[in-house]
């Protein structure tokens, strides 16, 4: 379970939103909605431990009984998908995926896991491809699998569907939510689009 207790973000002593309390169970997708500038992305940055120091914060972030507030970003075991896929342009598709794998996984197993991930998203045979040669929908799928290969314990979604066209958006949404359920990941989606919130099927909170 991902649990937020009395989370508050302020900048220059001005609160971005009222104190936030929520619980997200394993395999559940909870949506946080609100207009641009209300603090949705800042909330996710705070959860990840990457919020700029200009913000003042309070409250507790708890994941599976671990308090995350004082942990470094890489110790929090949170996966995040952004609006942009953020694939490394100097690495192949396969190398992008392998980058996320824990160091304890060695060469042959790494290759097998990368190929399995590509097969799972219907991109078999694209291991050596340049990410720039992929379509937007293909890049989005690779970004999702890279996030999951890092073995996160919760998933954060920062409007990852917003730059896709309507057809791709619906298909990618289904894929992301299906993997959240399959991997039993507490998932927090921030969006301004009611269609995303409806598709998530979980609780909806407005900032």
Regions inferred by a protein language model and the residue ranges of each:
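Hydrophobic anchor residue at the start of the ABC signature
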Residues: 144
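Catalytic Walker B motif of ABC-type/P-loop ATPase nucleotide-binding domains
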Residues: 155-159
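Conserved ABC ATPase "signature" region
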Residues: 67, 108-126, 177-178
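ABC ATPase NBD coupling module
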Residues: 66-82, 103
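A short, proline-enriched helix->beta-strand linker immediately N-terminal to the Walker B motif
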Residues: 149-153
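ABC-type ATPase nucleotide-binding domains, specifically the catalytic core motifs of the NBD
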Residues: 52, 72, 91-111, 120
């Amino acid at each position: 379970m991902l649990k937020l207790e009395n989370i508050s973000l302020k900048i220059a002593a001005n609160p971005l939103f009222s104190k936030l309390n929520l619980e997200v169970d394993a395999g559940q997708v909870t949506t946080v909605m609100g207009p641009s500038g209300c603090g949705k992305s800042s909330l996710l940055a705070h959860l990840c431990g990457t919020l700029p120091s200009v913000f003042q914060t309070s409250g507790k972030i708890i994941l599976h009984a671990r308090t995350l507030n004082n942990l470094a970003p890489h110790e929090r075991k949170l996966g995040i998908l952004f609006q942009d896929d953020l694939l490394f342009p100097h690495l192949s598709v396969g190398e992008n995926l392998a980058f996320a794998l824990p160091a304890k996984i060695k060469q042959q197993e790494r290759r097998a896991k990368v190929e399995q991930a590509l097969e799972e998203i219907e991109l078999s045979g694209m291991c050596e491809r340049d990410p720039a040669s992929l379509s937007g929908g293909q890049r989005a799928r690779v970004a999702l699998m890279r996030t999951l290969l890092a073995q996160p314990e919760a998933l954060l979604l920062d409007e990852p569907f917003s730059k896709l066209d309507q057809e791709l958006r619906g298909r990618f949404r289904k894929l992301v939510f299906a993997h959240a359920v399959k991997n039993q990941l507490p998932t927090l989606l921030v969006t301004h689009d009611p269609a995303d919130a409806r598709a998530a099927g979980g609780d909806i909170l407005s900032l």
